[in-house]
Amino acid sequence: MYIGAFQDTLFVDMLEYFGWVTVGKEYLDIYRPNGVPVAPNAVAASISGKEEMKQDNQTSTDSMSTSTQQETDASNEDIERAMDTDNGLDKAMSGGQGVFGTEEDDSSTKDASKPEEADPFLVEFLGEDDPRKPWNWSFSKKTFVIVQLMVLTCINYMGSSIYTPGQEQIQHEFHVGHVVGTLNLSMYVLGYAIGPIIFSPLSEVSSIGRMPLYLWTFILFTILQVACALVRNIAGLVILRFITGILCSPVLATGGASVGDVCFPRYVPRFLGAWAVGAVAAPVMAPILGAAMVVAKDWRWIFWLMLFMCGATLLSIIFFFPETSHECILHRRAKRLRKLTGDDRYYTKKEKQEEALPVSVFIKNTLWRPIKMIALEPIILAFDVYIALCYGAFYLFFEAFPIVFAGIYHFTLVEVGLAFLGFCVGCVFAYTALIIFQEKVIRKKFLEGKFRPELFLILAMCLGWCLPFSLFFFGWTARIHWILPIIAELFFVLSVFNLFQATFSYLAVCYPEYVASVFAGNGLCRGAFAAAFPLFGKAMYDRLSTKKYPVAWGSTLIGFITVVLSLIPFVLYKYGPALRARSRFSPDS
């Protein structure tokens, strides 16, 4: 039972590799009944076609019975067409060209319309209800997979900021200053900004998929926590933090794609939002755990705690996290058929496409295209700068909080960590606003047939004021009462979280064929800003501080910049269609 339910997990892969289990025998009766190769989709399509014709005839007979029934049928057809449009948009938001593994569905539909031309050696899903297709997994299995994704994402994001409560001890032990001590945070963030440039395209290769990248990099990530806990010099710690940042990046970059692999397209935005809540909440919860370790033991126990959390998560993933990429699942099916039958003619469409793609072209698209699109596309450049500054401002709070809560209110190390929980409360409000916007604006426009990509920007336009307000409010109320800076956190998350969701949805729809490159470039910009801001943050606050307002002018400086950048959604709402029409990468050009 376990083998059947989790046949594409690492543990089952190992059992299969050593010959202790055989997976895929059930497909022999489907693809080679009586030893003769057949195209199972052709048979399924023929049967499906007859059933659909019968249903159409019955529907037309019933529809002539009363005019009321005709109106109901017409209304249902309108809703179905709107849902089809909804699904199409969600596929575009998911990456169009396979970022969420939806290519095979279109091709399967096209092949089904011409069963006489079906290739008996072409391996595809056995119709839309194929039980091995992740969309058709049981609800409990889908939930378990998504929960594992969220836990894995949270732990990797925790790795960035869990270190911060122990920074003073590290500086004292290794006799270094604040900037060098902060490098351990910055290099980790820079690592997970660079990693997606390499790992995101690899996750789209059908012979690799997502699960092996998540697992093998996380295994190395877990092992290196031991090295971080035992290191004896600051240079070694900085290097280890950079490497672990790179290793944690696969799930941070493509975890959303795995959510899309598992969920039906129309539900993807909701679950992506929930996954993003974990990505925001994890870095702000980590300082609480780090502070507890520093108070109870010392800074090295921060990494021992990371080791224990990683180890428990790793066991779950090894045994229960299956491959989710649709194309990789088909590749595995074809590979098993080739092995079981001894016939090398079984293949998938993705395999043929990859064989025809030169390695040099793949590398060029991977490394150069994200930078090229930033340089040539004003829409991408504008939002990359905007989001990068927001992300940098987020990491500035790790420098500002000790100044405010420890310096002014004399909070303990653990209490300073607890002050970050305002961001978590803000996530609840932010996610609620996102769901309301999707239902009341986006979905409504779909049903009316009036959707256009710029509608996503309404969310950023409505909440854009919250970002500069939160920075001004945080800076100028810091000495009034400790609760006021925490309230500012709510407004910050409300704005930044929904800016991210609106921007990523907008960019994905504008550039569906190049969404992986768009997001890789955006991640690089975000990581670069987030790595740099903590390095100069304390110096900025110290230079601009006054006795009464220690963080006011520093926060105000960033706040004024965000005021200017908050105009970007308004400008692109008006001029976005014209810019897309002149783009060399947009399908609207």
Swiss-Prot record:
The residue ranges flagged as biased composition, category Low complexity, are: 56-73
Query: Mind telling me which residue stretches traverse the membrane in this protein?
Result: 143-163, 179-199, 211-231, 234-254, 275-295, 301-321, 378-398, 417-437, 455-475, 480-500, 516-536, 551-571
A GO cellular-component term linked to this record = plasma membrane
Pfam families annotated for this entry?
A: MFS_1
What membrane topology term does the record carry? Multi-pass membrane protein
Keyword annotations for this protein, in alphabetical order, are: Cell membrane, Glycoprotein, Membrane, Transmembrane, Transmembrane helix, Transport
| SUPFAM superfamilies the UniProt entry points to | MFS general substrate transporter
Q: Where is the composition biased (Basic and acidic residues)?
A: 107-116
Q: Does the keyword Calcium apply?
A: no
Molecular function via GO? fluconazole transmembrane transporter activity; xenobiotic transmembrane transporter activity
Query: Cellular location of this protein?
Result: Cell membrane
Entries under CDD domains matching the protein: MFS_Tpo1_MDR_like
List every stretch annotated Disordered. 50-116
Q: What is its main location?
A: membrane
- Family annotation (Gene3D superfamilies): MFS general substrate transporter like domains
Please give the record's induction comment.
Expression is regulated by the transcription factors AP1 and PDR1.
Gene Ontology biological process terms, A to Z: xenobiotic detoxification by transmembrane export across the plasma membrane
Q: Which family does it belong to?
A: Belongs to the major facilitator superfamily.
Q: What is this protein called?
A: Multidrug transporter FLR2
Provenance organism: Candida glabrata (strain ATCC 2001 / BCRC 20586 / JCM 3761 / NBRC 0622 / NRRL Y-65 / CBS 138) (Yeast)
* Name of the gene this protein is made from: FLR2
